[in-house]
Amino acid sequence: MSLMIRSSYVSHITLFQPRNSKPSSFTNQISFLSSSNNNPFLNLVYKRNLTMQSVSKMTVKSSLIDPDGGELVELIVPETEIGVKKAESETMPKVKLNQIDLEWVHVISEGWASPLKGFMREDEYLQSLHFNSLRLKNGTFVNMSLPIVLAIDDDTKEQIGSSENVALVCPQGDIIGSLRSVEIYKHNKEERIARTWGTTSPGLPYVEEYITPSGNWLIGGDLEVFEPIKYNDGLDHYRLSPKQLREEFDNRQADAVFAFQLRNPVHNGHALLMNDTRKRLLEMGYKNPVLLLHPLGGFTKADDVPLDVRMEQHSKVLEDGVLDPKTTIVSIFPSPMHYAGPTEVQWHAKARINAGANFYIVGRDPAGMGHPTEKRDLYDPDHGKRVLSMAPGLEKLNILPFRVAAYDTIEKKMAFFDPSRAKEFLFISGTKMRTYARTGENPPDGFMCPSGWNVLVKYYESLQESEAKQQAVVSA
C-alpha cells in the first residue's frame, strides 16, 4: 500500500479551555468543503456549538483534555500494600499469561483504557463488541471499540472453580498481580472475530497469534498489579504512562498536544505532515503545540519492522533535526496491534485522550492491512478517518486527517501532492521501501534522513544474514 499522507486543518475557531477546568464542548464531526479551494487549512471544518470568530480574536489557554470517565485509572498496588497483596496472591488459583496478555495488563494498569479497571466482565464485553462503547454509571458513554479480555482454557477454569480471586503469572513465571471478584463466561471466538474484523477469513495476524489458540472461556475482574510492567529490553525509558505524559506536557507548558501513531519508520513525508501540523496549530493561535510521536510497541505482524529498530530510527530523525526535539516527545504506546481498521483506530484515538492529547492525526487506511486471501485492501482506506469523525465517545478529540504527500521528482524532496503535476510525483509504498533496504539500494534523495535510512539497511542486512544461516543449517 502506498504511503499516502493526508492533512487538513481547522480554520477560524475559538477555543477557551482554562487550566483545571473541563474542556470546551467540541465535537469531532467534520465536513469537507469544495476541493476547488487551494488553501488546505480550509478543507476541513470542525462543527461545534461555540461561536466561530477570527483567529485574531481567539483566546487560548493551556489545558489538557480530561481522561475518559473524568479520572485517570492507575492500578499499581501502593508500595505499603505490596507485601500483603503478594502473600495473598500465593494462595490464589493461578492464570498463566502469554506475551500479548501481559501487554494488555500493561495497557489496563496504566490507564490507557480508562475508565476500565480490569479485564472485561461479560456486560462490558458485550457493550464493547456490539456498541463500541461503555455506558458509565452516570449514563454517559465512553468509546471502547476493542474488547479487552483474558482467555483461559478448560483446565484453568476448573482449577479456579468458585474462587473469587486469581493470581496472574507472567510468561517468565513470576506473579505480577491479581484479578479480583472474577467472572467467567463463554468465549465465542467466531462472533468476536467477525464483529471486530468484519471477516473470519484465515490469515488475520492477531487472530492467528492470539485468539485462535486461546481458551474457550473469558475471565474478567478488577486488576491489581504489584509493580509497573517492565520489559528490560533497553526501551523501558520510552514507555511513558498516561500520567507521565500528562506531567511532561505540563512541564513543557503545552497548550495543544497532537498525537501521531505509526508502526513504520519515519520518512520525510511523515515529518512534513507533523511539522506542517504544528505550523497550522500556531496559526490557529496556540502558543506551544507539542507533538507526541507515539509508535505502537505491542504485538505486530512478522513483516513489520521490529520495535527496537524503529526506535533507533526515530532517534536518528530527531538527532538530524528532521523533527524538533524541543517540541517532540517520543514514547511507546504499549498496545498490541489488531489490524482491525476503522474499529481499531477508535481505540488508538481513545487511548491518546487518556494520555492528554487533544488532537489526533489520522491517515489513509489507519490500522488496516491487505486482505489476507484476496488482492485488495481489507478496509476502505478512507473509512478510518470518517469513522473517527462520527464515533460516539470521541467528541472531545479533534481529528486531523492527512493531506497526501509523495516524493516530488522535480524538487527532489517529499512534498504535498499537487494533482496538476501528478506525473512528477512518486509514491513509494512500504513494500518498495523495504525492497530498497533489503537490496541495499538507496531511495531517492530527500525521502528519509540518511542516518535513519542506514538503521533500516543494517537491520535488513542482519536479517538476510540470519536467514542465510538458518537455510544453511536446514540444507546441511
Curated annotation (Swiss-Prot):
The keyword ATP-binding applies. One of its GO terms (biological process) is hydrogen sulfide biosynthetic process. Keywords: ATP-binding, Chloroplast, Cytoplasm, Nucleotide-binding, Nucleotidyltransferase, Plastid, Transferase, Transit peptide. Its EC number is 2.7.7.4. Residues 1-56 form a transit peptide. Mostly expressed in leaves or cotyledons. Pfam families: ATP-sulfurylase (PF01747), PUA_2 (PF14306). It catalyses: sulfate + ATP + H(+) = adenosine 5'-phosphosulfate + diphosphate. Induction: In roots, upon sulfur starvation. InterPro entries: ATP-Sase_PUA-like_dom (IPR025980), PUA-like_sf (IPR015947), Rossmann-like_a/b/a_fold (IPR014729), Sulfurylase_cat_dom (IPR024951), Sulphate_adenylyltransferase (IPR002650). PANTHER family: ATP SULFURYLASE 2 (PTHR11055:SF37), BIFUNCTIONAL 3'-PHOSPHOADENOSINE 5'-PHOSPHOSULFATE SYNTHASE (PTHR11055). This is ATP sulfurylase 2. It comes from Arabidopsis thaliana.
